[in-house]
């Protein structure tokens, strides 16, 4: 057997997805087309990989850190010409296919302990997005993180991450995933989400994105405080009041109560007035 004697390792945050219904919903959300080149992160024993290879995709490229799993995956899919495998850390290795082409979709049950940095690698930052965005990413995440990504203003889990991701992409829920869908079962609930990055022409212009990022860092450091206090260092009170009145923003609101669009308007107001330079 390809994986004989191999057990899930905590240091790699390994939990094998064994729920056929969830695997089907992941593939449905990926909407795989014949010319698609798929990137899978952390394929584990290959349950999702097998489904991806059974689709019409032209190529499936996986990145796996666990050397023992790499050996098993190569044995299991040795006869699959459309499959390529990169051993290494997904945060540092090249994500191109074996022939040098880039993947256009990401479909993955990602290790929860690298969610933040991996999202940044796949999507970029608000002020430095990736040059060539993926068409879509179907990711199995810890439910708490997924909720923060798609949270609405005013919800307790709405955060700077919510604003950043929603200004970079359209984010929707695919399905909930309970612990019993994995072996071994994790201690947390999970969720599959669909992330559809905005096209380059739909992104914020660089200076505006930089200003938004600066405001988010300043405001969400003290998310329980009113904007009057969190933005006090951004500009003098009189000018802050005038800008808030012009934009219809109440300075008694807290950071998590403003929508992504409102943060953009606030940043645009600062740029228009040229009141303060964004942080480098």
UniProtKB/Swiss-Prot annotation:
Per its database record, what is this protein's job? Specifically dimethylates two adjacent adenosines (A1518 and A1519) in the loop of a conserved hairpin near the 3'-end of 16S rRNA in the 30S particle. May play a critical role in biogenesis of 30S subunits.
Predominantly, its location class is cytoplasm
Chemical reaction(s) catalysed: adenosine(1518)/adenosine(1519) in 16S rRNA + 4 S-adenosyl-L-methionine = N(6)-dimethyladenosine(1518)/N(6)-dimethyladenosine(1519) in 16S rRNA + 4 S-adenosyl-L-homocysteine + 4 H(+)
Instruction: Name it.
Output: Ribosomal RNA small subunit methyltransferase A
Supply one GO molecular-function term: RNA binding
HAMAP family per UniProt? 16SrRNA_methyltr_A (MF_00607)
Keywords from the UniProt entry: Cytoplasm, Methyltransferase, RNA-binding, rRNA processing, S-adenosyl-L-methionine, Transferase
Q: Where in the cell is it found?
A: Cytoplasm
Q: What class of enzyme is it?
A: transferase
Read off the InterPro entries from this record: KsgA/Erm, rRNA_Ade_diMease-like_C, rRNA_Ade_Mease_Trfase_CS, rRNA_Ade_methylase_Trfase_N, rRNA_adenine_dimethylase, SAM-dependent_MTases_sf
Q: What is the lineage of its organism?
A: Bacteria, Bacillati, Cyanobacteriota, Cyanophyceae, Synechococcales
Q: Look up the EC number in the record and give it.
A: 2.1.1.182
Family per record: Belongs to the class I-like SAM-binding methyltransferase superfamily. rRNA adenine N(6)-methyltransferase family. RsmA subfamily.
Which residues hold S-adenosyl-L-methionine? Answer: 15, 17, 42, 64, 89, 109
């Amino acid at each position: 057997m390809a994986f004989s004697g191999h057990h899930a390792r905590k240091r790699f945050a390994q939990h094998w997805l064994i729920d056929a219904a969830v695997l089907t919903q992941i593939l449905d959300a990926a909407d795989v087309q014949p010319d698609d080149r798929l990137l899978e992160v952390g394929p584990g024993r290959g349950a999702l990989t097998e489904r991806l290879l059974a689709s019409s995709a032209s190529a499936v490229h996986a990145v796996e850190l666990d050397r023992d799993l790499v050996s098993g995956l190569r044995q299991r899919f040795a006869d699959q010409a459309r499959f390529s495998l990169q051993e290494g850390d997904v945060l540092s290795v090249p994500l191109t296919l074996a022939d040098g082409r880039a993947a256009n979709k990401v479909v993955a049950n990602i290790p929860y302990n690298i969610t933040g940095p991996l999202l940044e690698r796949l999507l970029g930052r608000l002020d430095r997005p990736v040059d060539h965005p993926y068409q879509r990413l179907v990711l199995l995440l810890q439910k708490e993180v997924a909720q923060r990504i798609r949270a609405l203003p005013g919800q307790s889990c709405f955060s700077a991450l919510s604003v950043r991701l929603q200004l970079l992409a359209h984010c929707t829920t695919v399905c909930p995933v309970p612990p019993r869908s994995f072996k071994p079962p994790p201690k947390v609930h999970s969720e599959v989400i669909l992330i559809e990055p905005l096209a380059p022409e739909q992104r914020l212009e660089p200076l505006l994105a930089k200003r938004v990022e600066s405001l988010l860092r300043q405001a969400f450091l003290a998310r329980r405080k009113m904007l009057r206090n969190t933005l006090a260092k951004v500009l003098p009170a009189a000018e802050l009041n005038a800008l808030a009145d012009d934009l219809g923003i109440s300075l008694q609101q807290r950071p998590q109560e403003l929508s992504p669009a409102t943060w953009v308007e606030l940043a645009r107001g600062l740029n228009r007035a040229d009141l303060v330079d964004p942080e480098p």
